[in-house]
Amino acid sequence: MRQGAARGCRWFVVWALLGLTLGVLVASAAPSSPGTPGVAAATQAANGGPATPAPPAPGPAPTGDTKPKKNKKPKNPPPPRPAGDNATVAAGHATLREHLRDIKAENTDANFYVCPPPTGATVVQFEQPRRCPTRPEGQNYTEGIAVVFKENIAPYKFKATMYYKDVTVSQVWFGHRYSQFMGIFEDRAPVPFEEVIDKINAKGVCRSTAKYVRNNLETTAFHRDDHETDMELKPANAATRTSRGWHTTDLKYNPSRVEAFHRYGTTVNCIVEEVDARSVYPYDEFVLATGDFVYMSPFYGYREGSHTEHTSYAADRFKQVDGFYARDLTTKARATAPTTRNLLTTPKFTVAWDWVPKRPSVCTMTKWQEVDEMLRSEYGGSFRFSSDAISTTFTTNLTEYPLSRVDLGDCIGKDARDAMDRIFARRYNATHIKVGQPQYYLANGGFLIAYQPLLSNTLAELYVREHLREQSRKPPNPTPPPPGASANASVERIKTTSSIEFARLQFTYNHIQRHVNDMLGRVAIAWCELQNHELTLWNEARKLNPNAIASATVGRRVSARMLGDVMAVSTCVPVAADNVIVQNSMRISSRPGACYSRPLVSFRYEDQGPLVEGQLGENNELRLTRDAIEPCTVGHRRYFTFGGGYVYFEEYAYSHQLSRADITTVSTFIDLNITMLEDHEFVPLEVYTRHEIKDSGLLDYTEVQRRNQLHDLRFADIDTVIHADANAAMFAGLGAFFEGMGDLGRAVGKVVMGIVGGVVSAVSGVSSFMSNPFGALAVGLLVLAGLAAAFFAFRYVMRLQSNPMKALYPLTTKELKNPTNPDASGEGEEGGDFDEAKLAEAREMIRYMALVSAMERTEHKAKKKGTSALLSAKVTDMVMRKRRNTNYTQVPNKDGDADEDDL
């Protein structure tokens, strides 16, 4: 009803303005043609008789019930005509009834209404102006700084050191040309606490033995199957990115080669390895980068109540050392600061790490976002924290969330204050002030919001009011708990969802809701104010046209009249358009100079009912009276609403009909200025990154596999090949034999081992040389050459035995047999036979030579037999020398030159 009233009021104002405008335009455009007595008009008698033509117009005049020709419309409205042309009106235009039928055919839904005068039985009044609503807004909008925390899914990481000994026992069968492993036993043994502290950390050495328990039996493994010694730790061959390592040996010990026997060899490799360790909430165990689990809390110890932490091992397997100075096994440098060192022995290894207290080393929450501008608004029973920077809205309760309920949440307050102070100093220090202390709220999805309210410096006087409001939101019991109560207070771990989409959707909904509510609020306010303004116009317009105002108000056609400050209304009766006939003249024949201001009509309530005379009112109203009279004026032009169109009367006579489309429409609507929803781009926002999700697990399988596959490369020499030596057993036996004889035996052993080694090397060299084809050929040639030399030596010995002089002096004997010197032959002839003295001397010399040879043989045999034989030989030598000195004289040398010439 209010909407209809508003439309009616606007139409009334517009039509009033339009009527005044058209009147002015018509008056200014109409030509002045006074003295037009022959105006052609068809009038109808008061009893409703047929219309008759006016006299001075020649020809028959159209009657009132003449039907207009169908589909005959003027192309353009005819211009105003002077009064003298009234005779041509009937001939130049179609009859009124034909035009009316055209209008009725085009607008079959146009109805007419007969409105009886109201009697006052029903009266109405207008509603008083209403109080317009205010725009819906959130309560207590507050700006501030926020730090959003999420669940910390990252594990607690720390450095640990592993001490263990790799024990390898290999069984080898040696053949003549090959070796075969019959079995390899590998095990890992822990390093005792004393060895870790007194040997490895103090001196950088490790024992060559491994003592450990397997199957409840204590066993000991000896490196190289030898006595216990200290072995130097050396850096590993290949270090990883996150750890270092040291070990004592690169090569596996294999037993000495003894063909056709099974031999065993033991290798003990002491390994010290720095590894990364991880532990996740509730920190009851941790795992090493090698994949080994330790079922003890990394915070277990004997200090500050840490003995209450979880452990699955016996007490004698754990040791805590205060004032421990770690040593770098590569540089041998000692740490400058002492630490508290935890040591734990497991069946496979010993692990050590620096002990730290649980608080504040770990925290179950971590900082996610720092928001410079966070708007907090109150909707119903919740707070909504919205930020355009991250396109997110968080919903929380109105009460703060106490940090004491967060298990291991010591880092929250410190990190939040540091971030807020940094943001405030950078951005708000000169324009805003802080309101109270940071507040903490638990949002949906497991996000903890640390919020610092801010106030502009211009609103500083409102600080007290805001502070009081904040105090009302504090928990019911803000007093600090008594000592010891925190231990009994229930704590919880906040679980944060891995998706932020719900907060993004909440932000989108709030963004749209805020825009729509603001828009609808403005529309509601404008509508209410417009209604109040129009109500004043309606109150004034009802005095001018109560029928139109009443019809627009009640939403249907009624008749009304003012009864003081109220209106009396009556319901109008609809009349079909086919039962209404308009007459073609508006002049009153009985009263010259008087004319009707509205066209006259005849109508029937029903199709076969009696004809009723009346007058056409406004908006297709059929008035039962004909009292709308005005003085006739010159240049009269009027447009009257008739059915679905208009009828045009000129000089109080019908001219032609027009449709509504032929009249220019002036809009009375007020444009509604609605701001379109602005574009908003969502930025990618992740609660947990891929790296955080990947790193959240307790065990990094990639790191474990990488370390396991690098173990042999780091702590073993995979390139060196040891060939089995058959003489190794002999050398090992000789070495062990001489080692048991003390220092002198070791000295002698070195000499003997050197000689034996040389012999073995020579034999090995010969064997290697013989195995070469070229060497075998060379040896064959040498053998043939040796046989040839032996043959010639044998021949020489045989000749020496048969004829020594000929063998010793072949040339001399040859010259004696065949003399070539003539002088010698002559002298021989003169001299005759050989000199007997010289022959005797020669015989004597030969005899003494034989004697000397016999004496030397006797002395040599006496040396072999003993001391008595040696004395006998000496006495014999003295006798022979004495005898030789008395009987032997030197042969004169005076004939030497002659003898030489003779020879």
UniProtKB/Swiss-Prot annotation:
UniProt topological domain (Intravirion) ranges: 795-903
Signal peptide coordinates: 1-29
Span(s) of short sequence motif Internalization motif: 888-891
Keyword Endoplasmic reticulum: no
Function of the molecule: Envelope glycoprotein that forms spikes at the surface of virion envelope and binds to the host cell entry receptors MYH9/NMMHC-IIA and MYH10/NMMHC-IIB, promoting the virus entry into host cells. Essential for the initial attachment to heparan sulfate moieties of the host cell surface proteoglycans. Involved in fusion of viral and cellular membranes leading to virus entry into the host cell: following initial binding to its host cell entry receptors, membrane fusion is mediated by the fusion machinery composed at least of gB and the heterodimer gH/gL.
Biased composition (Pro residues): 52-61, 475-484
GO cellular component: host cell endosome membrane; host cell Golgi membrane; host cell plasma membrane; membrane; viral envelope; virion membrane
Membrane topology, as annotated: Single-pass type I membrane protein
Family according to the record: Belongs to the herpesviridae glycoprotein B family.
Membrane-spanning parts: 774-794
Gene Ontology MF terms: receptor ligand activity
Stretch list, region Hydrophobic membrane proximal region: 718-771
Name of the featured protein: Envelope glycoprotein B
Annotated glycosylation sites: N86, N140, N397, N429, N488, N673
Residue ranges of the region described as Involved in fusion and/or binding to host membrane: 172-178, 257-264
HAMAP family recorded: HSV_GB
SUPFAM superfamilies hit by this protein: Viral glycoprotein ectodomain-like
